């Protein structure tokens, strides 16, 4: 499949709400939460006023002019927060485009971008049963903390 990875455009920032919802891990057999769940404060931390902080950066994957995946970072007090100097990462790819290497490409490109901005580390939080754990580990992320449901992972750039 042909796709392009590029920087998000300002007029596309609202799409991050859709990708935030897509990033919520839903185990097989579990009813998805209502889309309004993204309005809770702990999830809005990922997208509220995106682009206004100097460390806000996002890339998107595009297929035939349609944005089908997004990855973004910002320094925030989220589930994956480790310190005030380390951006936290969020990402998702629409279901029908998963398993084709698009997420891996988005991740690789964003890590290069963040390194070019002088960051030495990226963090994230991921549900232990999420298939993306394998992708993060393959990319070089290491588990630095965990609770009963999630891993906190970091990668040195």
Model-predicted regions and their roles:
Residues 137-147:
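Conserved acetyl-CoA-binding loop of GNAT-fold acetyltransferases
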Residues 8, 91-93, 126:
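Hydrophobic adenine-recognition pocket in adenosine-nucleotide-binding enzymes
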Residues 90, 99-112, 137-138:
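Conserved acetyl-CoA-binding loop-helix of GNAT-fold acetyltransferases
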